[in-house]
Amino acid sequence: METNSSAAFSPLPVPTTFIVNVIHAHPGKQEEAFAIIQDVVHYVAERKEGFLWSTLAKSTDGQTVVNIEAIQAAGNVNEFFSDPVFAEKFRKLDDVSKSEFHTYTVGDLVLPKRVAAL
């Protein structure tokens, strides 16, 4: 199912909710942890209306993976975890990592204040 992305830049703070997963991979398991959270995020992106966008990144020291994910509202978290397929996919992280999961709401957007030289 193809959909149009609703992701867009806004120069003002918008009441967006973010999920931040910090995944502390077991030694030598960063790539596997990345693949698991990538699978989870793609599953959500393809099926859940509350999903807006995600950025997945690996630390350069090989120890962590982070998922910064924008969702429409904090209630989407319960919606995602109530899906048994999602929950099973997410639990696979326990085999290769210890992870933290936090929900945030935007409080400020800081942009550069420098004036470009001509």
Give the positions of each predicted feature.
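An N-terminal domain-start capping segment
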Residues: 8-20
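Short beta-strand/turn micro-motifs at beta-sheet edges
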Residues: 4-11, 54-56
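Short, well-ordered beta-strand segments in beta-rich or mixed alpha/beta enzyme
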Residues: 17-24, 52-84, 116-117
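Short, low-order "capping/linker" segments at domain edges
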Residues: 107-118
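An amphipathic, aromatic/His-enriched active-site/gating alpha helix that lines ligand/cofactor pockets
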Residues: 2, 43-53, 70-105
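Short, surface-exposed ligand-recognition loops at beta-strand->loop->(often short) alpha-helix junctions
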Residues: 24-35
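Eukaryotic N-terminal targeting leaders
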Residues: 1-2, 118
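Short amphipathic alpha-helical/adjacent loop interface patches that line ligand
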Residues: 37-41
